Regions:
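Short, charged alpha-helical segments
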Residues: 140, 144, 162, 166-169
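Radical SAM enzyme core and accessory elements
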Residues: 164-183
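Conserved AdoMet/S-adenosylmethionine-binding subsite of the radical SAM
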Residues: 1-154
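Conserved phosphate-binding/catalytic loops in two-lobed NTP-binding clefts
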Residues: 151, 155-165
Length: 183
């Protein structure tokens, strides 16, 4: 929603608004290619994070339906153009989901994308959400995945180990719970 986001960013950055420095703001996107290219023209030096979550189209489409409209090849090309325009490193966000995108082949593909873009990789273990079939990988698999990405020479790799997932208070877990009564 770039038309709504730009005025909001302007207000956040303005000394008459929140006055937050642009370099302290990271905009995360699912990967709408035309909007990434449009954002590249925005004058403030905000940072960009891409919710990649899969190294190939088949895997990414399971997690990110937007990939059907903007496949990885187009997304990576748009990221390259963003970087060329802005001269800023971007972040590739990658949620690790057991049995879906946590195999070492995906780690190799992720590292390849990161090298091409000279991008930071932020690995995020999935937080279990009631009613969803996905699960967090075992810690040994998370560490193996991270090691493989590093071994493949991704420029920078971080692993976000969040707190609160055991009490449903971590990223992606906060939501309204309602009981539905039948008529």
């Amino acid at each position: 929603n770039l038309p709504a986001m730009i005025p909001a960013l302007d207000q956040i950055l303005s000394p008459d608004g929140l006055g937050i420095g642009a370099r302290h703001i990271t905009l995360s996107t699912s990967g709408l290619v035309p909007k990434i290219l449009e954002l590249a023209k925005y004058p403030a030096q905000i940072r960009l994070a891409i919710s990649l979550h899969g190294g190939d189209n088949r895997t990414r489409e399971q997690i990110m339906p937007i990939n059907k409209h903007y496949p990885i090849e187009e997304l990576i090309d748009a990221c390259e153009r963003f970087i060329e325009e802005r001269k800023k490193m971007i972040t590739l966000e990658y949620i690790l989901i057991k049995g879906v995108n946590d195999d070492l082949g995906q780690a190799i593909l992720l590292a390849r994308h990161a090298r091409r873009l000279n991008a930071k990789v932020n690995l995020i273990p999935y937080n279990k959400v009631e009613g969803m079939k996905w699960e967090r990988p075992e810690l040994s698999q998370i560490n193996a995945f991270r090691s493989q990405v590093e071994k493949e020479n991704a420029p920078r790799v971080t692993l976000r180990m969040e707190k609160g997932h055991d009490i449903d208070a971590a990223c992606g877990q906060l939501r309204l719970r309602e009981t539905v009564e039948s008529c």
